[in-house]
């Protein structure tokens, strides 16, 4: 009898629950965000980064078509039923572009707030 080419399909337990190095960890990672997200100010972190961002993308000298599209998507995210999650996802998917913009403007405060948003919320 020939062995199945996909032996993981014949097991009763899902592939993700099988013994793996990640399943063998017994220590809790440092920082509460990996366990509960308790005490993290998601809204405040997002608001601070958006305030920095708006200074640049609303200014005709530093805004462009890319950021105009971002503003339209942000307005749609904020008006939807899942505004919190949609806004967080939108910021997450544009984090590198925001970082580039803040670096180009040499805005250290914006970069610090963006780093905090990345580390605590993404």
Curated annotation (Swiss-Prot):
Record-annotated membrane-spanning stretches: none
Pfam families given in the database record: CowN
Name used for this protein in its record: N(2)-fixation sustaining protein CowN
Alphabetical keyword list: Nitrogen fixation
Gene Ontology BP, a term: nitrogen fixation
Superkingdom of source: Bacteria
UniProt record similarity statement: Belongs to the CowN family.
Lyase as UniProt keyword: no
Source species of the chain: Azorhizobium caulinodans (strain ATCC 43989 / DSM 5975 / JCM 20966 / LMG 6465 / NBRC 14845 / NCIMB 13405 / ORS 571)
Function: Is required to sustain N(2)-dependent growth in the presence of low levels of carbon monoxide (CO). Probably acts by protecting the N(2) fixation ability of the nitrogenase complex, which is inactivated in the presence of CO.
